[in-house]
Amino acid sequence: MSPAHPERRRQLANTPNTELKGGLKSRHLTMMSIAGVIGAALFVGSGKQIALAGPAVILAYVGGGILVILAMRMLGEMAVAQPDTGSFSTYADRAIGRWAGFTIGWLYWYFWALLMGWEAYVAGQILHGWFPLVPAWGYALLVTVSLLIVNFLNVRNYGEFEFWFALIKVVAIVLFLVMGSLALAHLWPWGEANGWSHLTSQGFMPNGPKSVVVALLGVMFAFIGAEIVTVAAAESADPGREIIKTTRSVVWRICLFYVGSIFIVVCLVPYNAPGLTEPTHGTYNVALDALGIPHAQLIVNFIVLTSVCSCFNSALYTASRMLYSLARRGDAHRIMQITGRKTGTPYVGVLISSLFAFAAVWMMATSKMDVYDVLMQATGTIALFVYLAIAFSQLRMRQRLQARGVRLEFRMWLFPWLTYAVIVCIVAALVTMVIEGTYRNEVVYTSILAGVIVAMGIVAQVFGIGTRARAEAELAPAGAE
């Protein structure tokens, strides 16, 4: 053996690993794609939108669902052609410019990193309600550390946890749909809720068309997460096939789980029912009470606890992978792309992404969660910014691929007209949010945050910061053909 071999081995041993190992199976991705659109916003938060718009909130969920379906179709087209852990952030980089990928990547990371703290807070409150001997912040810390350990292990562990979290949520929704359908058909033997009476008894749109528009803006927050599967698919054996399958299924998932559930609720429960807007009750709790289900609050709290743990788990995974992708492109410190040699997990990114959760635990312990609420306001419209970036990226990438004669395996419908329609709808929604006032602060705070990040991205692009990492990642510049 050459004497250079031992030296070569030492060099390799001292060189940080920067490759993901993968390991997600098809069943993991299937359930992750379902879990991505089912969260506490459905089980509890939807009550606020129902109280706002009445039964016509169904139109808001249908409208929001259509927008998400179109955004996922556009993202699916790009992801099948070029699977990447950075997903839409990478595509924005290639199609629009480095500043765009930089901005949307960091905004998306901020959203999920901050959301983890809120999920830990909710989990802590639920567990404290069950077992009051331990303070809520103690339970929040326990949840944070436990799921941090899960994400430190290989990606298959994350997939397994998310599979079972998602399964619990799916079973809960299916049972609710069955019970609700029986009640609508006058076949449910318990409770006071039977038939369709509340759908029109106080008017289908009691607060006017404007309330539906405002509710639609709130609904958009609930749908974010559907795109996570395009990030995770890059760590599977056949990313293209998995993305096609899950993207096609997003239509029935949104129709069944969201529109179906909300339709049953507004039929069985008056839109002004006490408890719909209370955090301690929520949509499913009020509906189950109407169906005469004993211990409804305990059941819903268990489902919500599962949902927030699932969301925390997905948030930590997604945030760490976005940091990894940003680092690979020279848009974050290169230490963020270091992965474990055995696990292939970007453990530095996982740890950094969890810091907001630990900050939330500290704020809970010191009664300063109002500060966290202010930070959360800057996340309110990030979903719309993400969908806008997806639409512009798909528009540019499709035009370039068509010019080169590339045949796409998965395509956006009615291109470019539906893409233009999505852009117009999102811009109109943002303008409406500013004019109407209910979500004005969210738009302003998110826009300020985005403006700061855009400026940083432009500086990085102009001065060539991180160009070595970009060259190693073999990223074509946005204007390349």
Show where each model-derived region lies:
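C-terminal membrane-solvent junction of multi-pass transporters and transport-like membrane proteins
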Residues: 164-165, 336-343, 384-436
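Helix-loop-helix junctions that connect adjacent transmembrane segments
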Residues: 15-20, 57-58, 132-135, 167-302
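Membrane-interface "cap" regions at the ends of multi-pass membrane proteins
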Residues: 1-47, 51-56, 68-73, 85, ...
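TM-loop-TM module centered on a large, flexible mid-protein loop between adjacent transmembrane helices
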Residues: 90-92, 97, 129, 215, ...
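A generic transmembrane alpha-helix motif of multi-pass inner-membrane proteins
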Residues: 183-184, 374, 378-386, 414-481
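Helix-loop-helix connectors at the membrane interface of multi-pass transporters/channels
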Residues: 1-4, 8, 89-94, 99, ...
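Extracellular loop-to-transmembrane helix junctions
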Residues: 21, 44-140, 253, 259-260, ...
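Membrane-interface loop-to-helix entry segments
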Residues: 124, 137-194, 224, 247-255, ...
